[in-house]
Amino acid sequence: MRPIMLVGHERPLTQVKYNKEGDLVFSCSKDSVASVWYSINGERLGTLEGHTGTIWSIDVDPFTESCVTGSADYSIKVWKVQTGTVIHTWTAPVPIKRVEFSPCGDYILAVLDDVMRYPGSINVYKVSRDPVTKEIKEFVEEPILVINTQENHKGVTVAGWSAEGKYIIACHKDGKVSKYNAKTGEFITSIELHTQTIGDIQFSPDRTYFITSSRDSMAYILDVESMEQLKSYEADCPLNSACITPLKEFVILGGGQAARDVTTTSAREGKFEARFYHKIFEDEIGRVKGHFGPLNYVAVNPQGTSYTSGGEDGFARIHHFEKSYFDFKYDVEKAAEAKEHMQTASA
């Protein structure tokens, strides 16, 4: 896989995201600027400028009409993708660590950090759209839902929506994962999963299960309804991000030795690679090198044809999957396919 390097940020990347169609990549960074790129060739469409601090998170709605950013400058901004202009700003008492549109695009989830005596919360904001153009016409200024952190939990680091926006899944600094009713904010359950802070949560294409990644070098897949642990993946370095690939039964893990702990310039020592694991068998099947610092985020194209990594080195790298990626199968998978083919032929 020959990567396309996206050069446009001056400081470490914090998140990269594809739109639903997979033709655009959105990136944000500690340089307070977000960028929009064509995923096919890495050409930059433009920048989103207006924040005055680190942009910790970015997301794009299902219609690629608008995108939302959350920043350390205590603000959440909504942007019109076509023009790159700010169409609304919400202010908060603390930095925003994660933002995400609901699957229907009518709600925005924001994770507020637990700093400066603020206990931390998940705020949900509502927007109203034109039924035809899907353009946002109205913003509700106050959050319609504020989910405060449970007493016996540490602050929320990241959160996301389940299928149809039914639940909000939240990950905590103490390694716990919580589930809330997205309509009422009611706490449903929580489990102790990781031994260190959880840095990322990403969902399967149908949003019925999700993967978490942590500084404890582990990634887990959990079922949304039962909160049961389905799979686990162990890496040899702290993990910052993990995603689930469509089309193929793989997961991609990204991380590496923390930048402040690196005492050598060798990328091999820091383990700055994207790791591919088989989703079912939990085996590591390959690595992709390239970054010369930890991978802060990995995101996969919803169409399953590429993935993008954002690094501490200030670069994002788009990797388009080659034929060998799609052809890769375990012997047991090949045998199962051959058996199915024979049964179909004889039927």
Swiss-Prot record:
One of its GO terms (molecular function) is translation initiation factor activity. GO terms for biological process: formation of cytoplasmic translation initiation complex. Keywords: Cytoplasm, Initiation factor, Protein biosynthesis, Repeat, WD repeat. Gene3D superfamilies: YVTN repeat-like/Quinoprotein amine dehydrogenase. InterPro entries: eIF3i, WD40/YVTN_repeat-like_dom_sf, WD40_repeat_dom_sf, WD40_rpt. It comes from the Eukaryota. SMART domains: WD40. WD repeats lie at residues 8-47, 50-89, 91-135, 151-190, 193-232, 290-329. It is found in: Cytoplasm. Pfam families: EIF3I. GO terms for cellular component: eukaryotic 43S preinitiation complex; eukaryotic 48S preinitiation complex; eukaryotic translation initiation factor 3 complex, eIF3e; eukaryotic translation initiation factor 3 complex, eIF3m; nuclear periphery. PROSITE patterns: WD_REPEATS_2 (PS50082), WD_REPEATS_REGION (PS50294). Component of the eukaryotic translation initiation factor 3 (eIF-3) complex. Belongs to the eIF-3 subunit I family. Component of the eukaryotic translation initiation factor 3 (eIF-3) complex, which is involved in protein synthesis of a specialized repertoire of mRNAs and, together with other initiation factors, stimulates binding of mRNA and methionyl-tRNAi to the 40S ribosome. The eIF-3 complex specifically targets and initiates translation of a subset of mRNAs involved in cell proliferation. This is Eukaryotic translation initiation factor 3 subunit I. It comes from Vanderwaltozyma polyspora (strain ATCC 22028 / DSM 70294 / BCRC 21397 / CBS 2163 / NBRC 10782 / NRRL Y-8283 / UCD 57-17). The lineage of its organism: Eukaryota, Fungi, Dikarya, Ascomycota, Saccharomycotina.
